[in-house]
Amino acid sequence: MRRAIAGSLSCGLSAAEWACNSGFSRIYADTSVAGQGLLAFFAGRTAPPRLVLLYTGVFKTMKSKHPIGILGATGAVGQRFIQLLENHPWFEISWLAASDRSSGKTYAEAAKWRLDTPLPERIAKMTVSPAEPEGAPKIIFAALDAAIAREMEPKFASAGCAVVSNSSAYRMAPNVPLVIPEINAEHLHLIEEQPSRRESGGYMVTNPNCSTIGLVMALKPIEERFGLEQIFVTTMQAVSGAGYPGVPSMDILGNVVPYIASEEEKMEAETLKLLGKLQGHSVEPLFARITAHCNRVAVEDGHMESVSIKLKRQATHEELLAAWAEFRPLAGQGLPTAPDQPIQWAAQPDRPQPRLDRNRGNGMAVT
């Protein structure tokens, strides 16, 4: 079976929305996770973030908003966090942190705002704090490069913070959940295996690679009903996924770049972990063969993927469409930005297309 998948970038959620202009970010809560207010940020289907909030209902009933912080606030992903969170019904940005050269300045002085909506006046006047746990709120959205995240994120978790990370640094760590809420919320139980959870109550949760999210969203209902033996995916990834300033115009205009560093390895490993089963204190990855070929194309926002799969059990065209149409694991939960239909089918032979389909479900659906 072959079908292209376009990940939508919503009002601007992108990795590059994320990272600066494209993305599949979202923020929502899931009351079905019992016992704890678990937070998870998921990075975008196209290049950036996708935020996911898994909670216990406490946010719906509280009279005041819950304070949150953004680590790496002046960068492209940090700016997207601000855009997404500034008017969220449950959260209030109370702390912004960045590098030493930004610390002590107002946010307007420290950051060059590059998004398509105005910098909120309240945020512009906030003072940027040092990137240290002292004074930070208990919920942190981390928008750091992987090398920096590897050092900084455990420090905040050890200080008792819930760290929701957009970085790849700890995605494949055995005791760190890699989560898409529609797919594998039960993996959040791995939090209990983290030393920081036992010592201070803090923990880390990670989001997948932007291209992985769209792929796994489409595969999950098929894997549940028919099983997967083999997956072959070729991506056509928007420049938004490279962040800002991104790919030089002389490299990408009128061109296709058939290489994105570490992208293929990330897609292959993350897909199998996300579709794996929680077995005791660890995740048993899905037993399937997967091959990814990743390409950067001259499209501003919205990734496209061409996917071929081999099933364990035979399925008709109608059965596959039904599996997608009936996949609504978060329906009825009142999550602020979760799409009612996370997987949408475009029947036209020349669809999906990033320009035409990336904003379905307010940019949160896969087509």
Task: Label each PLM-derived region with a short phrase.
Residues 10-14, 24, 35-38:
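Short linear segments in intrinsically disordered or otherwise low-structure-confidence regions
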